[in-house]
């Protein structure tokens, strides 16, 4: 049986690996790691048969690792030969989310200033992240709610399946 290394239990890449395994008609045992960094040595060392990480550029530096696909809408610029999971026939688009919130009832002008400040900061961060192989998406307002709703929809089913399996034990 396949063993799939990922970052932590119930992290975005752990849940995405479970979704991908289900979509591919298989499964495999999830092997949590303390971060993305330990995944490549685990894969190269044969401790796992596959790895799901936020950025696999480090793995590309060895001829023993090949990136099979990405969970983005479009191919990752820094990994142009790696197809998206959608290109491979799996409706899997996902990733990690970082959000900033303010208390309900916060003055709309303050919200606007915060959004502007984070937008400018994000431009700086996004370029560095792109160089590291990450795909950055910036969303505010309704777009952010839509993004969170999509993530909830993606993960809800797999989390319910995990809960049902735990009840059976």
Task: Please state what every model-predicted region is.
Residues 1-169:
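Conserved, function-defining micro-sites of small-solute handling proteins
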């Amino acid at each position: 049986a396949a063993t799939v290394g990922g970052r932590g239990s119930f992290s975005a890449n752990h849940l995405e690996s479970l979704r991908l395994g289900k979509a591919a008609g298989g499964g495999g045992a999830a092997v949590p790691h303390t971060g993305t960094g330990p995944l490549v040595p685990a894969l190269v060392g044969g401790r796992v048969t596959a790895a799901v990480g936020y950025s696999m550029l480090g793995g590309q530096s060895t001829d023993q690792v090949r990136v099979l696909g990405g969970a983005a809408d479009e191919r990752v610029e820094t990994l142009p030969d790696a197809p998206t999971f959608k290109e491979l026939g799996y409706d899997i688009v996902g990733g990690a989310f970082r959000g900033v919130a303010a208390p309900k009832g916060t003055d709309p002008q303050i919200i606007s200033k915060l959004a502007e400040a984070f937008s400018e900061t994000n431009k700086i961060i996004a370029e560095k992240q792109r160089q590291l192989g990450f795909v950055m998406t910036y969303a505010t307002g309704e777009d952010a709610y839509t993004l969170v709703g999509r993530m909830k929809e993606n993960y809800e089913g797999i989390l319910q399946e995990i809960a049902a399996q735990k009840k059976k034990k």
